[in-house]
UniProtKB/Swiss-Prot annotation:
Belongs to the peptidase A8 family. GO terms for biological process: proteolysis. It catalyses: Release of signal peptides from bacterial membrane prolipoproteins. Hydrolyzes -Xaa-Yaa-Zaa-|-(S,diacylglyceryl)Cys-, in which Xaa is hydrophobic (preferably Leu), and Yaa (Ala or Ser) and Zaa (Gly or Ala) have small, neutral side chains. This is Lipoprotein signal peptidase. It comes from the Bacteria. It comes from Gloeobacter violaceus (strain ATCC 29082 / PCC 7421). Residues 151-173 are annotated as: Disordered. The keyword NAD does not apply. GO terms for cellular component: plasma membrane. GO terms for molecular function: aspartic-type endopeptidase activity; endopeptidase activity. Keywords: Aspartyl protease, Cell inner membrane, Cell membrane, Hydrolase, Membrane, Protease, Transmembrane, Transmembrane helix. The active site is at 116, 132. It is found in: Cell inner membrane. Its EC number is 3.4.23.36.
Length: 173
């Protein structure tokens, strides 16, 4: 692990590992379209294959998405290696973004589609996966890092005020 931006690498490795492990497990347990109710009507594991982007946008004609995933992944690695030393929130944020991009990018290159399985039915949310969670957590970390750095930014210096001199006693007293 690089000594520079260590939280970046740790967050990326954990996100990639958790995404791969959960996808492999779900694919071994469920057939496409099959669902297991963990909390009936609220949260299910439902195996779906998504050839598009988030929420199945661009489904079917998304070959370019794998190249975007690769470009983003390479760009984030280069930034972590040759860019500035980042604060811990930024390191974790960019690392989680890398983990999500690699997780879904791997699926796109290996299978031509992304494995989704987390199904929140209570709010009718589109089915998603661990890489999607990593991307959203990464964005949240970057937002927190930005807000924290703004709150620590020192206020601009005030212009020097004119010195008021005390009157000197010229009466000798």
């Amino acid at each position: 692990m690089s000594a520079k931006n260590p939280w970046f690498w740790l967050a990326a490795i954990l996100a990639i590992a958790l995404d791969r492990l959960t996808k492999v497990w779900v694919v071994a347990q469920l057939a496409p379209g099959e669902s297991i109710a963990l909390w009936p009507g609220v949260f299910h594991l439902t195996l779906v294959k998504n050839s598009g982007a988030a929420f199945s946008l661009f489904a079917g004609g998304s070959d370019w998405l794998k190249w975007i995933s690769l470009l983003v992944s390479v760009g984030l690695c280069v930034y972590a290696l040759v860019g500035p030393h980042l604060g811990s929130w930024e390191q974790m944020g960019f690392g989680l973004l890398l983990g999500g991009a690699v997780g879904n990018g791997f699926d796109r290159f290996a299978f031509g589609e992304v494995t989704d399985f987390l199904d929140f039915r209570l709010i009718q949310f589109p089915v998603f996966n661990g890489a999607d969670i990593a991307i959203n957590l990464g964005l949240a970390c970057l937002l927190i890092g930005t807000l924290r750095s703004e709150s620590r930014t020192p206020a601009p210096a005030r212009p020097a005020s004119k010195q008021i001199r005390e009157p000197t006693d010229t009466t000798g007293g």
